[in-house]
């Protein structure tokens, strides 16, 4: 059996390139022509804000392009209390206040969680003075056990010497 040629020949490459070119040109031809925001002036806020790049000024019923180079629209363009973007029922002042309160709440929550976790982790781990006190206590306990064992062995020797050793079963004699 002869090995099959799996590579693309120049004929197939040209055909594939032509198909891709047709698909890309067809996709770009289907886009509707972009309508400027100013065409929605003196209409409704809903019509203006269907296009996300538009800003509605409620004061003079004007629809204009959102000034993307600036974060907030300047007062010369429209007052913040009259400016609408995204939805018609929220003005920019309310949006700014709401977003700052939510952002502050999130930051405060994260800070509280971090402080709580750090404090909890710190309280779980004994500090150096606690470790030293525990070590000293353990050393005292070990010395006490050694002294106890030493005293017991001395007492047992004395009992053995004088024949006072405790028997396993005291009723064995009878």
From Swiss-Prot:
<feature type="topological domain" description="Cytoplasmic">
    <location>
        <begin position="115"/>
        <end position="174"/>
    </location>
</feature>
<protein>
    <recommendedName>
        <fullName>Pituitary tumor-transforming gene 1 protein-interacting protein</fullName>
    </recommendedName>
</protein>
<keyword id="KW-0325">Glycoprotein</keyword>
<feature type="transmembrane region" description="Helical">
    <location>
        <begin position="94"/>
        <end position="114"/>
    </location>
</feature>
<keyword id="KW-1133">Transmembrane helix</keyword>
<feature type="domain" description="PSI">
    <location>
        <begin position="36"/>
        <end position="89"/>
    </location>
</feature>
<keyword id="KW-0812">Transmembrane</keyword>
<keyword id="KW-0539">Nucleus</keyword>
<dbReference type="GO" id="GO:0005634">
    <property type="term" value="C:nucleus"/>
</dbReference>
<comment type="subunit">
    <text>Interacts with PTTG1.</text>
</comment>
<keyword id="KW-0732">Signal</keyword>
<dbReference type="GO" id="GO:0002039">
    <property type="term" value="F:p53 binding"/>
</dbReference>
<feature type="region of interest" description="Disordered">
    <location>
        <begin position="125"/>
        <end position="155"/>
    </location>
</feature>
<keyword id="KW-1003">Cell membrane</keyword>
<feature type="glycosylation site" description="N-linked (GlcNAc...) asparagine">
    <location>
        <position position="42"/>
    </location>
</feature>
<dbReference type="GO" id="GO:0005886">
    <property type="term" value="C:plasma membrane"/>
</dbReference>
<feature type="coiled-coil region">
    <location>
        <begin position="127"/>
        <end position="163"/>
    </location>
</feature>
<feature type="glycosylation site" description="N-linked (GlcNAc...) asparagine">
    <location>
        <position position="51"/>
    </location>
</feature>
<keyword id="KW-0963">Cytoplasm</keyword>
<dbReference type="GO" id="GO:0031398">
    <property type="term" value="P:positive regulation of protein ubiquitination"/>
</dbReference>
<feature type="compositionally biased region" description="Basic and acidic residues">
    <location>
        <begin position="126"/>
        <end position="155"/>
    </location>
</feature>
<dbReference type="InterPro" id="IPR016201">
    <property type="entry name" value="PSI"/>
</dbReference>
<dbReference type="GO" id="GO:0005737">
    <property type="term" value="C:cytoplasm"/>
</dbReference>
<dbReference type="InterPro" id="IPR052304">
    <property type="entry name" value="PTTG1IP"/>
</dbReference>
<keyword id="KW-0597">Phosphoprotein</keyword>
<feature type="signal peptide">
    <location>
        <begin position="1"/>
        <end position="29"/>
    </location>
</feature>
<keyword id="KW-0175">Coiled coil</keyword>
<dbReference type="GO" id="GO:1902254">
    <property type="term" value="P:negative regulation of intrinsic apoptotic signaling pathway by p53 class mediator"/>
</dbReference>
<feature type="modified residue" description="Phosphotyrosine">
    <location>
        <position position="171"/>
    </location>
</feature>
<dbReference type="GO" id="GO:0043518">
    <property type="term" value="P:negative regulation of DNA damage response, signal transduction by p53 class mediator"/>
</dbReference>
<keyword id="KW-0472">Membrane</keyword>
<feature type="topological domain" description="Extracellular">
    <location>
        <begin position="30"/>
        <end position="93"/>
    </location>
</feature>
<comment type="function">
    <text>May facilitate PTTG1 nuclear translocation.</text>
</comment>
<dbReference type="GO" id="GO:0045732">
    <property type="term" value="P:positive regulation of protein catabolic process"/>
</dbReference>
């Amino acid at each position: 059996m002869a090995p099959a040629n799996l590579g693309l020949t120049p004929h197939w490459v040209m055909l594939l390139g032509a198909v891709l070119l047709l698909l890309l040109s067809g996709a770009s031809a289907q886009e509707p022509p972009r309508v400027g925001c100013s065409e929605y002036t003196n209409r409704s806020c809903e019509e203006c804000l269907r296009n996300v790049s538009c800003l509605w000024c409620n004061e003079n019923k004007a629809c204009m392009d959102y000034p993307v180079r600036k974060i907030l629209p300047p007062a010369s363009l429209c007052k913040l209390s009259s400016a609408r973007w995204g939805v018609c029922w929220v003005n920019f002042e309310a949006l700014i206040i709401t977003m700052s309160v939510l952002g502050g709440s999130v930051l405060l929550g994260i800070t509280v969680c971090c402080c709580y976790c750090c404090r909890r982790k710190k309280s779980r781990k004994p500090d150096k003075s606690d470790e030293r006190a525990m070590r000293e206590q353990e050393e005292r306990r070990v010395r006490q056990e050694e002294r106890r064992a030493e005293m017991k062995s001395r007492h047992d020797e004395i009992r053995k010497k004088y024949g006072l050793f405790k028997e396993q079963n005291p009723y064995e004699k009878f």
